[in-house]
């Protein structure tokens, strides 16, 4: 038997498949952001944040262990990883349509007529319904699935960056609240001592009822703050446990907020803002745009004829025992062409949907770039501002504590009224609390800057 026609048909089909595509070549992107960072945010030497490992950025070993626990056990990150596996499988399924699928077949046919019963046995290997992709429909569907896979992989990377940043922020928040609670409890003890002295003076007639009531006000205010902070501390630990995927050991929890992070230098003047394109969320939006472009190509190809090939080669015989004997070879080749004539507007509607999806993906891509630029610019602007605020707030705390000591001494000497002392105490207590809040804002902004510039993917730089 001459096998040449079938072999030539298969080779030709593989050569022609995927030779053409109707997908748009380029899509103009106009994100509407400056080409460079604002001048006020551009100074000094730049740190390659994306290459800076999170173990290098977060210096505290306890925090490193908590982040490691979160990366191992966080359920949201686990879902993101599984979504990558799912997208990879979907791409492989779609890619398989680009090559012929071979299948072995076996068949027995019995047929009865007036002349008697006949039997026919066949066995062979064949290709069924392989689409000759002359206009790129299958190719574009495969490309769309590939870009979707890349987008999901970028989203998984973004999920890790967010998890690292959120875990570090929750850990530092716990430390700040623990330190605030300690200050509130120490202040409460001091106020309770003052209340006992005020009660003793009042009993001797040395102070008024107003002074006693004002002292009690200080005590109850500090007591309320301490109770609130104890509840807040419990909530902080619950939030950290959710991020870490389980309870965090007590010896890994901070008892104060201290400089725990590597300071990030702002980018130098003239650094182009297109470095944001390396952010995983922007990369995901870009891949979604490319997938939408490929879907347009598939929708356009649906307007053209489709050619499918079916062929087989094997053996056929009326006797099972003679199935593979010489002279029993059989083959078939069945090309089929389908030309869409009337679909009730379905093809045009599918193309309109594909175009709309592309426009949506383009708008989302441009918005992702704009959002990334704003997030980074905001973090850079706050970076310098918060450093100045922390320094100023520390000077305020020092001055308030000095004023409190002097007011106490002058009150004891009878030179100042209790109202002056009361105001000094409140100012000192408030200054300490505000300093902690400012230090926490400084630390969390550094985490934000690390995240928005692409840091947190590598463990070590």
PLM segments and residue spans:
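Short segments within alpha-helical structural elements
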Residues: 192-195, 221-250, 299, 395-453
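Small/polar, glycine/serine/threonine/aspartate-rich low-complexity segments that form flexible
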Residues: 43-45, 49-58, 63, 68, ...
